[in-house]
Amino acid sequence: MSTKEKLISHVMKEEPVGSRSKVTVVGVGMVGMASAISILLKDLCDELAMVDVMEDKLKGEVMDLQHGSLFLKTKIVGDKDYSVTANSKVVVVTAGARQQEGESRLNLVQRNVNIFKFIIPNIVKYSPNCILMVVSNPVDILTYVAWKLSGFPRHRVIGSGTNLDSARFRHLIGEKLHLHPSSCHAWIVGEHGDSSVPVWSGVNVAGVSLQGLNPQMGTEDDGENWKAIHKEVVDGAYEVIKLKGYTSWAIGMSVADLVESIIKNMHKVHPVSTLVQGMHGVKDEVFLSVPCVLGNSGLTDVIHMTLKAEEEKQLQKSAETLWGVQKELTL
């Protein structure tokens, strides 16, 4: 008799039980690992699968996390074979090519499209009912690509979008007012990154509109220069990259925030990237961030934001830029 047999006597033969809340992270780079640890520490799933083409890095990261199993409640698995991801509820895609020095954005996009042509069909094969969350950049275009390649309905393909931009925005407003970010209600919509749109008309604390107190807020004529905050939001990522080489923690926490709303069916409103054709005067098939309701079925509803004419115009301009890039892609 083995030690195990001497120690344990079976009462019944256990049937294999599938995971009830499995999450997969594709890509074990800085963003993938920050997302993984954020999901683990928030205890959002009973199984976390990780997949990447870089076998040694993947194996090392999985082992490192598994060594902390005592401190977690989640089963952690990893393999370069996508079968390890089977029956995931949410699949987070962080994999993608990095921008080379002097490389055009369009060229980077096409390289990432080619990577997605391998990743997305594999996800669909093993988790045909999952909710796809795209984090790889440029996120709005790649969410469109994932939607096209997956054949999924639009409510099951979500881009992490401006969830992080809005978090940065609220943090900086909080710094200026000496308040916690959760008490500063503010939204950034549109394209994630350089041409994002801050909705100054909606910024409020305890229901008090800041633009009501300072009608010039967010404009060039504002003596308090609130507009600089949005510039800080846009420059924030570049600043972090300059200082530490990449961004990871905040985007990882942002991903876990979105995963939580889906897994726990919270019906919470987040600014995430979705198909905005027909909204705010957008005519083309593009994905941009608007406030959306996230729950167990994915993206269930879109909130109709009241935007000023100037804000709407910025949104349409972003849409045109994205469509210009998308129509050149070979899918």
From Swiss-Prot:
Query: Among the record's GO biological process terms, what is one?
Result: lactate metabolic process
User: NCBIfam families from the xrefs?
Assistant: L-LDH-NAD (TIGR01771), PRK06223.1 (NF004863)
Kindly list the positions annotated as binding NAD(+).
29-57, 98, 137
Would you tell me the protein name for this molecule? L-lactate dehydrogenase A chain
Reaction catalyzed: (S)-lactate + NAD(+) = pyruvate + NADH + H(+)
Self-association state and partner proteins as the record states: Homotetramer.
Pathway, per Swiss-Prot/TrEMBL?
Answer: Fermentation; pyruvate fermentation to lactate; (S)-lactate from pyruvate: step 1/1
Task: Name the residues that bind substrate.
Answer: R105, N137, R168, T247
The job of this chain, per UniProt, is described as: Interconverts simultaneously and stereospecifically pyruvate and lactate with concomitant interconversion of NADH and NAD(+).
Molecular-function annotations in GO: L-lactate dehydrogenase activity
HAMAP family referenced in this protein's UniProt entry, alphabetically: Lactate_dehydrog
Q: EC number(s) per UniProt? A: 1.1.1.27
Pfam family for this entry, one: Ldh_1_C
Q: Which GO terms describe its cellular component?
A: cytoplasm
Provide the alphabetized UniProt keywords: Cytoplasm, NAD, Oxidoreductase
Task: Indicate where this protein resides in the cell.
Answer: Cytoplasm
* Family label: Belongs to the LDH/MDH superfamily. LDH family.
Q: Does the keyword NAD apply?
A: yes
Gene name in the database record: ldha
Q: Provide the primary localization.
A: cytoplasm
In this protein, the active site sits at H192 (proton acceptor)
